[in-house]
């Protein structure tokens, strides 16, 4: 029974009714509110305490719950089972020992288990990016939720839309969903200094790439800097249209060497690996350069042109006739940009939300 009634005692006594009251009596210094658990949960905890020498830490040990639980937090809090609730109870009971500031904030301010996972997702939306603690909370939350599935992150993305001025600062590059949200924000609000912090890959893509080829270096630098920003913003300015018409009428691109000539210039093809990313253009050079630098690699770039029309069927002889033994063709970028199987349809969403997946293809390559 979970009720203890003592009649005719020699000393003052009180009545304990319900499992929570008994749990509170058994655990020294237990001050958690009864509302954080149901009667059934408290009863099961009481049963466990009676089997574990009335020691709550032994109960946590029984279910393999300790400070390492934070490393697999998604699994630990996803569900409504008794152990999931015990994880929440563990955090509430040990709140002062929590090292992750964001988790500590969420645990402190969450009153019941049912709201715990949602609060992990959305608590950051209540904090201004100007708050002196924001950056630390942002970074610690990012690590904390990195393994949560997109269906959980979607709750955060939706809640984060309420304040457009603040929302960009809270997004991360943990998931494709958030990366797309960054793109959508830019199409509506323009560029923000926050992009370099929240989405470094996009920032690297947008960096101005300085061409140093023998011909058209200035023109290519100007054109592709202009082009990339408009691609992300999903708009075309009149000035850019004039620039396109100017270059198209002058046929200045014909001054560049052909791709086939660049391939032929490789002296020892047996020591080279031909890696063809179909639909890869010079717009990605700033991003590719950043990736190479990050990996400690050196990079040499020759700027060339393909034959017109630029469809793959007309521009693949360099690959088919490659004299070296090692080659590979990556088609996913072309699928994303040009084909239905890439999964992006302008009729479904006019925003350029395909850009994050384009960058992911290049990163994996």
Place the predicted regions along the sequence by residue.
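…; additionally, a secondary subgroup of soluble metalloenzymes is captured
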Residues: 1-272, 279-365
């Amino acid at each position: 029974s979970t009720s203890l009634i003592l009649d005719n005692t020699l000393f003052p006594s009180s009545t304990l009714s319900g499992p929570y009251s008994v749990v509170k009596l058994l655990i020294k210094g237990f001050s958690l509110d009864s509302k954080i658990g149901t009667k059934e949960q408290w009863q099961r905890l009481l049963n466990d305490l009676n089997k574990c020498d009335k020691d709550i830490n032994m109960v946590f040990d029984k279910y393999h719950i300790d400070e390492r639980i934070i490393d697999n937090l998604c699994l630990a809090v996803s569900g409504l089972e008794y152990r999931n609730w015990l994880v929440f109870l563990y955090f509430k009971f040990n709140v002062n020992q929590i090292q992750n500031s964001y988790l500590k904030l969420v645990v402190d301010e969450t009153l019941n288990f049912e709201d715990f996972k949602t609060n992990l997702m959305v608590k950051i939306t209540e904090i201004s990016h100007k708050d002196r603690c924001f950056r630390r909370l942002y970074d610690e939350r990012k690590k904390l939720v990195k393994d949560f599935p997109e269906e959980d992150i979607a709750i955060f993305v939706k809640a984060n839309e309420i304040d457009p001025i603040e929302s960009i600062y809270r997004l991360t590059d943990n998931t494709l969903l958030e990366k797309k949200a960054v793109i959508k924000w830019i199409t509506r609000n323009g560029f923000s200094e926050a992009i370099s912090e929240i989405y470094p890959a996009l920032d690297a893509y947008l960096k101005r790439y300085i061409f140093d080829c023998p011909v058209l270096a200035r023109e290519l630098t100007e054109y592709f800097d202009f082009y990339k920003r408009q691609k992300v913003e999903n708009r075309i300015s009149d000035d850019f249209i004039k620039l396109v018409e100017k270059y198209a009428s002058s046929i200045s691109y014909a001054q560049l060497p052909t791709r086939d000539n660049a391939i032929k210039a490789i002296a020892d093809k047996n020591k080279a690996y031909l890696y063809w990313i179909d639909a890869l253009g010079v717009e990605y050079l700033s991003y590719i350069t950043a990736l190479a630098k990050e990996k400690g690699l050196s990079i040499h770039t020759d700027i060339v042109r393909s034959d017109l029309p630029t469809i793959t069927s007309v521009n693949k002889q360099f690959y088919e006739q490659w004299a070296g033994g090692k080659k590979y063709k990556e088609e996913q970028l072309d699928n994303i940009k040009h084909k239905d199987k890439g999964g992006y349809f302008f009729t479904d969403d006019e925003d350029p939300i395909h850009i994050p997946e384009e960058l992911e293809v290049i990163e994996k390559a």
